[in-house]
Regions:
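Extended low-complexity intrinsically disordered regions
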Residues: 1-57
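Hydrophobic/aromatic-rich structural module bridging two neighboring secondary-structure elements via a short loop
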Residues: 58-78
Length: 78
């Protein structure tokens, strides 16, 4: 699977979470309600990078990507 195909699969998962039959919690979220989560994940990623802990950094950067992509999709839905 190419990187583009993998990202599309990831994005399709986000769309499914926000769909009418998706996750109730995800459907209730707004960019503003997710703002603090994005900030927290970014700081956690920075801490992991500062600690020079690649595995932890990858995990936290994944969380940043998830939050940023979710928020971007929310704006796309408007």
């Amino acid at each position: 699977m190419t990187a583009q195909e993998e990202f599309q699969r990831f994005f399709d998962t986000i769309k499914a979470l926000r769909a009418p039959n998706g996750c109730p919690w995800d459907k209730e979220q707004t960019p503003l309600s997710m703002r603090n989560d994005l900030i927290e994940e970014a700081f956690e990623a920075l801490d992991a990078i500062s600690e020079q802990n690649p595995e932890h950094a990858k995990e936290e950067l994944g969380d940043v990507i998830l939050n940023a992509t979710m928020i971007s999709y929310m704006y796309e839905q408007e």
